[in-house]
C-alpha cells in the first residue's frame, strides 16, 4: 500500500487524477479524506465531515454562494472540485504520520486548496444580484487573482445528488457558470473597442471628433436611436462615450475600417480560448468591409451578432487598468497540507501586452469620464476612484427585454486594484441595475 501511495503521490500527473472518468480515483479516495477548499481569508467553502462510523459527507458551509466556483464532488464533479481533484486527493501529511495511518487503517488527510477569492466581496456580489439571473466576476488586474465569481441561477451543492434531476433537467441552467461561460450581446460596453479603433486610425486628430446628436441617426434607410430617443447635443469623443450615445457611436462605426476593427477584436481575444484553467466559452465577433451600413451601425454599438462573456470583459478592463498588460486569471493561490504547511504556490503571470500604454491611457480617460460625467455617476465621490463603461443590451429584436452591463475597475491607495464585470439579465439600463451591483462590491472590497 505504501508503494501504491508513493506512486500516485509523486508519479501520476494532475490531468490523470483529475479526470472524472478515472476509476482509480475511487482507490485513491479510500486512502485520503478529501481536503478543504478555502477563500484567501481562511473561510472554508468545501470540507469533508467524517462521522463516528467513518462515513464521509462533503459539506459546503455557504451553500449556494460559492456553488459555481467550488462546484461539487459527485456526478462527474464540477468547479474547483473537478479542477483541483488531484490536489484535494493528495496528502502531504508528514511521511511518518502517513505510514502510521496506513498501518492503523486510518485515512490520511488531503491537502487544502486555498483560493484567491475574497469572502466579503463574494458575499457582496451574491447579495447584490438578489433574485436576478446574471453574473459578477472581479479580478485583481496586476496579478490576475480572481476575487469574485458569482453566477445565478444557482444550486445548493449540499443537496446536488438528490436534486440532480431538477438542476440538470431540460430547461434548467442552474449548473451553467454565467461568469465564464455566458455569452451575451455586449451592448454599449463594446464601445470600448469601437473607440479604441477610432483612436488607432486617428491618433493625432481623435480629439477633433464632433457630432451633433438629435436622438437618432439614419444611414441607407436604417435608423439607430439613442436610449429614450434622448438628444445629447454637441459631443466630442469623450462626451459620446460618457453619455453612451448610440447615434454618435453609430457614426464612428461608419467612419472606421471594419476589417481593421475585426483585427483589433482578434487581438483583444475575440474568437479565441481565454487563458484560464476554468471552463469558459469564446467571445464572438465578425465584421468586414462588405457589411451593410445597418449591420455596421448595430455591431459598433454592441448589438448585431457579437457575443461576449463577463470573464472576457473583466479581463479587458484589467488590461486597460494595467497599462495594456493582461495577466492570466487564476483561482488557486496555493495548496497546503492539513497542518498549513505550503505544498505549492501559484504566482502571477503575464499573458501578453494586448494594447500599448498610450492606448490604455486613452481608454482610462474615457472610462473616468463615464463616472465623473456620465452613466456611471453613482460611482463618483467615493473613497476609491472608479472607471467604467455601462451597457444596456437588447436581448432580441422581438422583445423589449434588456440585459444590464457594467465593466470597469476601482483604485484606492493601500489596496490592490480591482476590475469587475457585471451582467444583470432581463433588468434594464446598466446605469440603473449593473452599476449598483458593482458599487456594492467596490464598497466592500475597498472598505468604503
Task: Describe the predicted segments one by one.
Residues 41, 101, 142-188, 193-427:
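Beta-lactam-recognizing serine transpeptidase/beta-lactamase-like catalytic domain environment
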Residues 1-164, 174, 183, 209, ...:
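Periplasmic/cell-envelope proteins involved in peptidoglycan metabolism and beta-lactam response
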Amino acid at each position: 500500500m505504501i508503494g501504491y501511495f508513493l506512486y500516485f503521490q509523486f508519479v501520476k500527473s494532475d490531468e490523470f487524477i483529475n479526470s472524472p472518468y478515472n476509476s482509480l480515483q475511487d482507490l485513491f479516495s479510500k486512502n485520503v479524506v478529501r481536503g478543504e477548499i478555502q477563500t484567501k481569508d481562511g473561510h472554508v467553502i468545501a470540507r469533508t465531515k467524517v462521522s463516528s462510523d467513518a462515513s464521509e459527507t462533503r459539506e459546503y458551509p455557504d451553500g449556494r454562494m460559492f456553488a459555481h466556483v467550488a462546484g461539487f464532488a459527485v456526478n462527474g464533479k464540477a468547479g474547483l472540485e473537478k479542477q483541483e481533484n488531484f490536489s484535494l486527493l493528495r496528502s502531504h501529511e508528514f511521511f511518518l504520520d502517513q505510514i502510521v495511518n496506513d498501518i492503523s487503517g486510518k485515512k490520511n488527510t488531503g491537502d487544502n486548496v486555498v483560493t484567491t477569492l475574497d469572502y466579503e466581496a463574494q458575499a457582496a456580489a451574491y447579495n447584490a444580484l438578489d433574485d436576478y439571473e446574471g453574473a459578477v466576476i472581479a479580478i485583481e488586474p496586476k496579478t490576475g487573482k480572481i476575487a469574485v465569481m458569482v453566477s445565478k441561477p444557482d444550486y445548493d451543492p449540499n443537496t446536488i445528488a438528490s436534486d440532480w434531476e431538477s438542476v440538470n433537467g431540460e430547461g434548467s441552467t442552474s449548473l451553467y457558470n454565467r461568469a465564464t461561460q455566458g455569452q451575451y450581446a455586449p451592448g454599449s460596453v463594446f464601445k470600448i473597442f469601437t473607440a479604441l479603433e477610432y483612436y488607432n486610425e486617428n491618433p493625432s486628430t481623435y480629439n477633433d471628433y464632433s457630432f451633433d446628436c438629435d436622438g437618432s441617426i439614419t444611414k441607407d434607410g436604417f435608423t439607430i436611436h439613442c436610449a429614450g430617443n434622448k438628444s445629447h447635443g454637441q459631443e466630442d469623443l469623450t462626451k459620446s462615450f460618457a453619455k453612451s450615445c448610440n447615434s454618435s457611436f453609430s457614426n464612428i462605426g461608419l467612419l472606421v475600417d471594419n476589417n481593421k476593427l475585426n483585427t483589433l477584436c482578434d487581438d483583444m481575444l475575440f474568437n479565441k480560448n481565454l487563458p484560464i484553467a476554468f471552463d469558459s466559452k469564446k467571445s464572438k465577433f465578425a465584421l468586414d468591409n462588405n457589411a451593410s451600413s445597418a449591420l455596421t451601425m448595430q455591431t459598433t454599438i454592441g448589438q448585431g451578432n457579437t457575443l461576449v462573456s463577463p470573464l472576457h470583459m473583466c479581463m479587458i478592463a484589467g488590461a486597460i487598468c494595467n497599462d495594456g498588460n493582461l495577466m492570466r486569471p487564476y483561482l488557486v493561490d496555493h495548496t497546503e497540507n492539513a497542518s498549513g504547511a505550503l505544498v505549492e504556490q501559484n504566482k502571477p503571470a503575464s499573458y501578453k501586452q494586448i494594447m500599448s500604454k498610450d492606448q490604455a491611457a486613452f481608454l482610462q480617460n474615457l472610462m473616468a469620464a463615464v463616472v465623473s460625467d456620465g452613466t456611471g455617476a453613482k460611482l463618483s465621490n467615493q473613497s476609491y476612484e472608479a472607471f467604467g463603461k455601462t451597457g444596456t443590451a437588447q436581448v432580441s429584436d422581438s422583445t423589449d427585454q434588456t440585459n444590464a452591463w457594467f465593466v470597469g475597475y476601482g483604485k484606492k491607495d493601500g489596496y490592490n486594484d480591482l476590475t469587475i464585470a457585471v451582467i444583470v439579465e432581463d433588468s434594464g439600463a446598466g446605469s440603473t441595475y449593473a452599476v449598483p451591483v458593482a458599487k456594492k462590491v467596490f464598497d466592500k472590497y475597498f472598505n468604503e
